[in-house]
């Protein structure tokens, strides 16, 4: 699996600050059929004054095609969060997909996270979060790579809610994201090159209008098994698609290693896609 030269530059930018500050470095990747590959990396830089900077990079390769960097797309992002109090955190983020394969986008969002209490009954340290933002797309060809007469440039306005808590020895997480409106409805046959599915490393194509996801994990000192389930709907389809994942994370010193499987189940069983994922995290 080959990655572009820009990836090496990003890795240097992410890794070099680690010698001078406290933070967490993580990389996730998946491999699939016909050369499909996706990779994400981020460095959580804690400035120790309530401010946390998190630069991120993503890479997505659709196939083994040699043309145009093997059909690949990159995404760059920055998340800035500030701990207002012990219970409240505010953040803002921006993500940019530069023009590649007749597609580009820019996303910006802001949100808050709140811990209402630290322990009550069987629940410990619950976290609630709300986010709102917009994404602007520019699409110059349809899903069959035929050029469009006029570029399709919609803006989507979205909202996102998240919740996380420990219930005895289980860790529960949930995410719901919904597009409130598109500035113009996505026409049939026009797609995006980069769409996120909660708890999944793999990247999918298409305008995702709504998604809901839950994840269950059983953390222990050295091993944490986990499983995730996602239900999502494209803007041009009435039916929902499903994705599931499962895996095991191993903890050694300040390092975490995890491996698992991600399965995407569209409307037709023949289109099922299976990916093998791996994640490495290190604290400094």
Q: What are the roles of these predicted feature ranges?
A:
Residues 9-18:
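Bacterial N-terminal signal peptides
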Residues 30-32, 58-66, 95-103, 115-119, ...:
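Sequence/structural signature of outer-membrane beta-barrel proteins
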